[in-house]
């Protein structure tokens, strides 16, 4: 069974950077050793957003973006290697999620698309890459997401305490870790995505630092109620979503009925949408003793305060309190999934995704043995 140092690479729906994590992994432990966040250039971020909003592009443009992202991921990995004074031969493999640009797991031809050419990562790092984790699950009738609940269970499951792990990235997803029960999990709806999109359009800021702007506004209750009537929130699990659904166009359609709304009030309402839509799902599943939050949303004091207020009797805290960096959780999960793949172990949970069976996930892009020698 493969064990040793692995690198996880994650570029999520928030587009706030490429998270790269170094970890020692074997069948008994996942020990994070180092991490960094690598910036995404503005032109690449724009290209990704255009695709996710359904903007037309040529196959040449898609191919270029695929290559450019692969090179960017390689740069991020090489920066971490240099920081830690490591050589390619010191790393067993890279687990790379890629950048999701479309996710449509239902219909006659369900599909998901992550770009960032893994061949370029191998060529520019000299390290074996495991990628393309989601499509096997979709081929088996699953949603292809979320994949992190299996990792949450491995690291944070408890024999007696009823726990939930909440990842607030661009999209928020919930893992239900209940003793004696199969792990469940699904996307609850927008996390940071709509808040980030609104402040970017209004203030040219990538995100609302410390929720300072939202705190200046007041929740527009009719707007909140209108958004919460979206059918996604009432849909049964398993379910997953992404930027192709909850995007700026979705927000504009809801705002059309509220001309002249104060921009700060809209930001406050979007923060409340994130908190309320999550809290509703926590309560729908019977609540828990501890809600452990990871992802960028764990650093949003307004969302965290609202979750605590909406969920009395539940301890709401970040995973940092349990010794696992909330910022690095997803990248760490894909390092772990790479280890699972190389060990021939399944990476999905049918109880989460709805797949017909558990399966080894991903494709392996082997490094040139000469490069790794």
Swiss-Prot record:
First-level EC class: transferase
One Pfam family it belongs to: AnmK
Q: Which residues bind ATP?
A: 12-19
Q: Which UniProt keywords apply?
A: ATP-binding, Carbohydrate metabolism, Kinase, Nucleotide-binding, Transferase
Please name the GO terms that the record assigns under molecular function. Answer: ATP binding; kinase activity; phosphotransferase activity, alcohol group as acceptor
Record EC number: 2.7.1.170
Q: Which reaction does it catalyse?
A: 1,6-anhydro-N-acetyl-beta-muramate + ATP + H2O = N-acetyl-D-muramate 6-phosphate + ADP + H(+)
Q: What's a GO biological-process term for it?
A: peptidoglycan turnover
Q: Which InterPro entries match?
A: Anhydro_N_Ac-Mur_kinase, ATPase_NBD
What family does the database annotate? Belongs to the anhydro-N-acetylmuramic acid kinase family.
Task: Give the protein name, as stated in the record.
Answer: Anhydro-N-acetylmuramic acid kinase
The organism encoding this protein is Salmonella typhimurium (strain LT2 / SGSC1412 / ATCC 700720)
